[in-house]
Regions:
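Extracytoplasmic/secreted cell-surface and envelope-processing proteins
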Residues: 9-13, 66-68, 92-93
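Structural motif
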Residues: 11, 34-48, 116-120
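Sec-exported extracytoplasmic/periplasmic mature domains
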Residues: 19-27, 47-54, 71-78, 98, ...
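Segments of small-molecule ligand-sensing domains
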Residues: 129-139, 150-202
Length: 211
C-alpha cells in the first residue's frame, strides 16, 4: 500500500520508482492513497485502508506528515511495517510520531550514525564538537558535496568551469562520508544506500545495500 504526498515531486518520484521496482520483482501494489503537504488529519485515509490486506505501507514524503500518519495508523491498530525515504531523517519524526508508534519503521537513507567506518565516526565527532548536535544525512551530504568539488578541482586539467565539470563527471570511487561513489554517464551518483530500522523512534539497525 502506498500513501504519498501528491503535492511533492520528491514523494511522487519515490512512489513511482518504488512501484516500478517492487512490481518488477514480483510484488503487488494493493492500493494508493494521497494527501498534500500541510495536512494534519489522516484518519479518513487510514480508516479506509484499515480493513485491506497489505504487508507494508510505503510512505514517501517528509517527516512532518509521516510522523503524524504513523502515529494515527498505530492508534487505529495498523501494525504493519512502514517504509519511507530520507525525508524521515529528522529528530522531529520522533517528536511528531511518539516513541511507541515508531517501531517496525524502516527508511532508506544516505548514511547512518550507526556506521562504524572511521570516516563516519570522525565526521560525527567533529560535527558534534562544532555544533553541539548529531548530524543528519543532509549535513553529511553537504560535507561530501564540498569535498567532492574540492577533489574534482584538484584533478581538473585547468582552473575553469569546463575543466572542473569534466573532472566531476569522471569521478570514480570517491571516498565520501555517505559512501564510496562514482558518477555515471548521466551524471548520477552510483553508491550504496542504507536501510535504517527504528526502535522507539531511534535508529537501532542499519544495513548498506548496493545495486
Amino acid at each position: 500500500l502506498i500513501i504519498k504526498d501528491s503535492s511533492s515531486d520528491y514523494a511522487k518520484g519515490l512512489a513511482e520508482n518504488f512501484k516500478k521496482t517492487f512490481t518488477a520483482a514480483g510484488g503487488t501494489i494493493v492500493g494508493e492513497e494521497a494527501y498534500v503537504a500541510g495536512d494534519t488529519d489522516f484518519n479518513a485515509i487510514l480508516t479506509r485502508v484499515k480493513g485491506q490486506q497489505f504487508d507494508a505501507i510505503y510512505l514517501p514524503g517528509y517527516y512532518q506528515e509521516a510522523g503524524l500518519i504513523i502515529k494515527a495508523a498505530r492508534a487505529l491498530g495498523i501494525t504493519t511495517p512502514v517504509l519511507g525515504g530520507d525525508g524521515f531523517d529528522s529528530p522531529d519524526l520522533l517528536k511528531l510520531g511518539g516513541a511507541a508508534a515508531l517501531n517496525n519503521v524502516y527508511f532508506t537513507n544516505h548514511y547512518s550514525s550507526l556506521d562504524k567506518d572511521p570516516k563516519v565516526v570522525k565526521f560525527i565527532a567533529d560535527f558534534k564538537t562544532k555544533y553541539g548536535e548529531e548530524p543528519n544525512a543532509f549535513h553529511a551530504l553537504g560535507y561530501d558535496t564540498a569535498k567532492f568539488v574540492v577533489d574534482a578541482i584538484g584533478r581538473s586539467s585547468a582552473l575553469n568551469g569546463e575543466a572542473v565539470k569534466t573532472a566531476l563527471a569522471e569521478t570514480k570511487d570517491f571516498e565520501a562520508v555517505t559512501g564510496k561513489l562514482s558518477v555515471d554517464a548521466n551524471h548520477n551518483p552510483i553508491k550504496a544506500i542504507v536501510v535504517i530500522g527504528l526502535k522507539d523512534g531511534v535508529q537501532a539497525t542499519s544495513e548498506k545495500v548496493s545495486s
